Amino acid sequence: GTPKGNAAIFDEWHKEGRHWEGVGYDFVIGNGSDSADGEIEPTFRWWQQKVGAHCGGTPGNWANVDGVGICLVGDFNHTYPTSRQMQSLAQLVRFLESRYNIPKGRIYGHNTTPGANGKTDCPGRHFPMFKLKSMLD
């Protein structure tokens, strides 16, 4: 994770540093550093329904093809998400669950996505997945 950034910064970094088409995520949720705390930024991948580049290594690339990539700005090995980030994340996930009939059991962190290559500690040891799931009830 990175303590600063926003969708535009990640877009540039993914283009220049990784030689991707652009930002790999469908949504970026700010932490107050380079966008508002809790601000949900949809990216071109969401607007154009482009295949993501947020979770490699899954069989058939299913997580990028069929999954929705949501990035929270922050390094959650060293800090916790802000309360506004968590509120926005829960709001966004509830919307996606309802709109696309996604069961709560299909909501994963990057490192717990079935079939992912496992070479990441994302979303970080301080990311409260249990809290997110309880916020969805």
In which residue ranges do the predicted regions lie?
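Histidine-centered active-site/metal-ligand motif
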Residues: 11-14, 26, 52-60, 110
